[in-house]
Amino acid sequence: MFYPQVDQDDSLILHTDLYEINMMYTYFKKGISERNSVFEVFFRKEPFGNGYAVNAGLSHVIQYLNNLRFNESDLEYLKETCDYDDDFIDYLRNLELKLTIRSAREGELVFANEPIMQVEGPLAQAQLVETAILNIINFQTLIATKAARIKVAVGNDGLMEFGSRRAQETDAAIWGTRAAYIGGFDATSNVRAGKLFDIPVAGTHAHSLVEAFNNEYAAFKAYAEIHKDCVFLVDTYDTLRSGVPTAIKVAKEMGDKINFQGVRIDSGDMAYISKKVRKQLDDAGFPDAKIYASNDLDEKTIQNLKMQGAKIDVWGIGTKLITAFDQPALGGVYKLVAIEDKEGKMRDTLKISSNAEKVSTPGKKQVWRIQANSEKKNEGDWVSRYDEDPRKFDALFMFHPQYTYINKVVTDYTARPLLQEIFHEGKLVYEEPTLKETKEFAANNLDGLWDEYKRSLNPQDYPVDLSQKLYDNKMSLINDIRSRIVKRGY
């Protein structure tokens, strides 16, 4: 059977759902494909029952948009597969990116029901990019958030990403690794991700090394003779009676010839075993040797182990991080919020639902992070019409968008806009920070969040409030649409 090679220079322009191109075709045939439009990306609920999400994926979106073009192979496929006329195929052939993209930067903490990315430009183009943008942002934000939860659980302990072999294919492995680094991980075992993104790489060895040499002493000695930095996996046979004593023996024999960094345990009762291992290492004169742990760990297991006094210094996390094991999808959506009418004026749009949480908020927006100057902690986010600026106010009235009686007045605050311009009419205008800077930015943002919002279980809801103008506009549009439906009788 023949399996086609994936072209590494593929622009990914066909990485979209068919209905996106069908809608493009409809817009084209009806003469509205070039009308200005505004779409926004947001999610309705933070993942994992968390109090926040860590934005990730923007760099990948930039890469995707920079290469957005149809090649002749793409066009031939569409012509053969779909009932599109030649004029539309020519339109696709001549497509040039004209979109303006605004986004929260990577590492920004983002919350439910606020735009994290805004796409403005020709309707057909803005429709085309929906699938890929959601695919990228949903996955990478999910992994970065899971990583941040784990980072909060381990505190100052070391964190290593071990998930490549359990990831859903190669791209998920490398982009998931990058997202995990943003979320707080220190290193990865994935060499390709290390090369591509300049992430520190680290690793120990597998049980197969021990089995290949028949016994732990021969295996550890062989490894130590080849590698300066040594972490020995000690649970192949018997951790306490064989593995750790053998690691200690080899470390003493090799002396200054190696850097004995510690031992790794991958099975058993890690709370009990790690305490025993710590005593063995200390008694042997290796108080600085670290204990590494792996074996289907996540933030819940780590919290329990710490409550039991586990003596673990470095945590290797794989399956439950890279697959977002307890919630494998974020659920981000992409909604039209404004469109140019036939008179050339922008008209706000919204989706109405019988579920209050699914009623979208119309209009082009900005998100402002409001921080109290006295505490240097976030008061909440204020979502406004794009032309509003809370920095001009002496006091800011903030209220819950559904339960308006929940409100407060904030004074002496700093307001920071989250949506930055990334592309301007198709041209990249954003200078990406380094990945290390992005990781530090995420950590600093977490420091600005009250602990009540960072709880892994039942966190306090973070305030995401609407400006009065935005709220009034939403209510006005809802009432207008309902009155028109009543007049029509359906």
Language model regions located:
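Ordered alpha/beta subdomains of enzyme catalytic regions
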Residues: 1-226, 335-490
